[in-house]
Amino acid sequence: METFDPTELPELLKLYYRRLFPYSQYYRWLNYGGVIKNYFQHREFSFTLKDDIYIRYQSFNNQSDLEKEMQKMNPYKIDIGAVYSHRPNQHNTVKLGAFQAQEKELVFDIDMTDYDDVRRCCSSADICPKCWTLMTMAIRIIDRALKEDFGFKHRLWVYSGRRGVHCWVCDESVRKLSSAVRSGIVEYLSLVKGGQDVKKKVHLSEKIHPFIRKSINIIKKYFEEYALVNQDILENKESWDKILALVPETIHDELQQSFQKSHNSLQRWEHLKKVASRYQNNIKNDKYGPWLEWEIMLQYCFPRLDINVSKGINHLLKSPFSVHPKTGRISVPIDLQKVDQFDPFTVPTISFICRELDAISTNEEEKEENEAESDVKHRTRDYKKTSLAPYVKVFEHFLENLDKSRKGELLKKSDLQKDF
């Protein structure tokens, strides 16, 4: 993938919003079948323009209105907010206190910077294949719980374009949830607690909740290769001292000695498991709980959610198919059938897909000179000729399931009415 030059972004965005952005699918998503009157019209969008100019409370009548505005403004970033009681672009005309956020998808934001205390390869905004496994585990753990523990059907996972992932839960019942219920859900999904000053961030009680057991089973599939080989979390004294801080002091000396005699993280982990197991058998009710090995695995691998993003109904989150202005990468949907294969470094940049389009356009110009073709039809075909196509397909698959589910619900309702 070619390098992205941020100085080219203004020109690239013009082309992207004119010829490549998947407007029809995007509108189809946020309109939700047009079942609820004014649902799309009451949705808040925010645009971040060049030089960090930020405009909130944008709203649009229809797909055409949205397209025109995006092509006029060429936003560097698009965020999606709640569905309000009134049109957001008229919020200043509404009586004080009457303008209220009413519905929104339940959203989750997982950012790699929140793992800086446990990843050794990168820090802050940087990511690499060695630490991306954290995002793979996060998607697997959170998605399994949303699907199986809560019964949520319509979950859209999206790469942020730089260092994290977002999830949009779009079931109709979920969009209506109160802030209190959202807080309860995100609390259920949170285990790693405490700021930078807190060394031990995971505390398990003797009774292990099924959610934790299932999460551990997912982590186990990745732990050896991710934590012991790639992150090498027991490589040297500095790294193993961090782990010793998570276990009772009474076993520190024994572990120090065995760690010094061992040659690598794999061997040291085996020693730790043996010593911890022996300790657990001897002391049933220690304040550290009986699950030392699991607590370490969870602290190093369990998802770290930004709680505030999930609990607030009026919280804005970056839109799918927005462009990251620093990396140039498109914020693309992730195929849940291929989570392990998803590679953020192969996600196309805006410069790459615009070059692809240029190359194709040059070849086709002669052919199309004689053909009258509508701009919409032309654009629908345009993204299909670029590396964006497979990601739009993932999005379309998600939308098809949403449509099927909605039609099923409408049929159920009409059958019930017939019974009366």
Curated annotation (Swiss-Prot):
CDD domains: AE_Prim_S. Keywords: Acetylation, Disease variant, DNA replication, DNA-directed RNA polymerase, Dwarfism, Magnesium, Manganese, Metal-binding, Nucleotidyltransferase, Primosome, Transcription, Transferase, Zinc. Its EC number is 2.7.7.102. It catalyses: ssDNA + n NTP = ssDNA/pppN(pN)n-1 hybrid + (n-1) diphosphate. Mg(2+) 2 binds at residues 109, 111, 306. A motif (Zinc knuckle motif) lies at residues 121-131. One of its GO terms (molecular function) is ribonucleotide binding. Changing residue 318 to A: Decreases the binding affinity for NTPs. Loss of primase activity. A ribonucleoside 5'-triphosphate binds at residues 109-111, 160-166, 315-318, 324. Mn(2+) 2 binds at residues 109, 111, 306. Changing residue 306 to N: Decreases the binding affinity for NTPs. Changing residue 160 to A: Abolishes NTP binding. The modification N-acetylmethionine is found at residue 1. One of its GO terms (cellular component) is alpha DNA polymerase:primase complex. Changing residue 166 to A: Abolishes NTP binding. Loss of primase activity. Changing residue 77 to A: Decreases primase activity. It is linked to Primordial dwarfism-immunodeficiency-lipodystrophy syndrome: An autosomal recessive syndrome characterized by growth failure with in utero growth retardation and severe postnatal growth restriction, severe microcephaly, absence of subcutaneous fat, and significant haematological and immune dysfunction. Patients have hypo- or agammaglobulinemia, lymphopenia, anemia, and thrombocytopenia. Most affected individuals die in early childhood from either respiratory or gastrointestinal infections. NCBIfam families: primase_sml. Heterodimer of a catalytic subunit PRIM1 and a regulatory subunit PRIM2, also known as the DNA primase complex. Interacts with PRIM2 (via C-terminus). Component of the alpha DNA polymerase complex (also known as the alpha DNA polymerase-primase complex) consisting of four subunits: the catalytic subunit POLA1, the regulatory subunit POLA2, and the primase complex subunits PRIM1 and PRIM2 respectively. Within the complex, POLA1 directly interacts with PRIM2. Belongs to the eukaryotic-type primase small subunit family. The bound zinc ion is not a cofactor. It is bound to a zinc knuckle motif that may be involved in sequence recognition and the binding of ssDNA. The catalytic domain (residues 1-190 and 303-408) adopts a typical 'prim' fold structure formed by two three strand beta-sheets that line the inside of the lower and upper parts, each surrounded by alpha-helices on the outside. It comprises a highly conserved catalytic triad, a structural zinc-binding motif and the nucleotide-binding motifs. The Asp-109, Asp-111 and Asp-306 catalytic triad binds two Mn2+ or Mg2+ ions which activate for nucleophilic attack the 3'-hydroxyl of the growing RNA primer or of the first NTP bound at the initiation site. This is DNA primase small subunit. The gene is PRIM1.
